[in-house]
Amino acid sequence: MKAAILLAFAGLALLSVICHASENVEQDSFEEVFSAIFAMEDDLKPKERVCRGYGLPCTPEKNDCCQRLYCSQHRLCSVKAGK
């Protein structure tokens, strides 16, 4: 009888260790998934443009509008007429 109880306690201790180890592995996999999601999120953020797009404020002296646009007298990037 004492041996059966001792064996039951040893089995419970072993089961506890196995469950704890599997939780650690599961936690690590969750951390990997979350870090991958956050890494992708950084890639999806809009990049800063080097030039100004249509209708955006600009500075005529800097000529900071994108190709085929010019800085109008209203200090907005506009489409070049002609070519």
Curated annotation (Swiss-Prot):
Single GO term (MF): ion channel regulator activity
Compartments, record wording: Secreted
Chain's role: Probable ion channel inhibitor.
Domain-related comment: The presence of a 'disulfide through disulfide knot' structurally defines this protein as a knottin.
Propeptide: 22-49
Tissue-by-tissue expression: Expressed by the venom gland.
Protein name per its UniProtKB record: U15-theraphotoxin-Cg1a
Coiled-coil region: none
GO CC list: extracellular region
Signal peptide region: 1-21
